[in-house]
């Protein structure tokens, strides 16, 4: 499982729009490698320069590690990304607080240099 922009607490924090989703959560991609996740994101959104910039750093983890950190993942395919997942917390928005996010962040390994 891969998070565009890395696995830092700041990048795992819910954005305003993500708090309105049902259930609230952040995007992940299931891909064989961080490089592949970055490539898929760039191909799916060719004009999204901000996403392309963010995709230079990828946070990678496993479903097992996410669950050990107290979170979960749900399949959430989109028209452009069939391998899109949503990372959620059982307590919803309230579960995305700094203590939980620090535990979640520790489950990620970051790689960089995924060229634009």
PLM regions: where:
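Short hydrophobic beta-strand segments
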Residues: 1-15
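Conserved NAD+-utilizing ADP-ribose enzyme module
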Residues: 10, 16-25, 32-116
């Amino acid at each position: 499982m891969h998070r565009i922009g890395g696995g830092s607490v700041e990048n795992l924090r819910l954005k305003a729009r993500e708090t309105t989703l049902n259930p609230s959560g952040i995007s992940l991609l299931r891909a064989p490698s961080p490089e592949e996740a970055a490539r898929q994101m760039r191909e799916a959104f060719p004009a999204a320069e901000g996403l392309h910039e963010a995709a230079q750093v990828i946070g990678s983890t496993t479903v097992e590690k996410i669950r050990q950190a107290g979170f979960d993942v749900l399949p959430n395919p989109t028209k452009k990304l069939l391998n899109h997942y949503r990372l959620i917390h059982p307590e919803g928005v309230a579960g995305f607080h700094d203590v939980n996010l620090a535990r979640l962040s520790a489950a990620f390994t970051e790689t960089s240099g995924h060229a634009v």
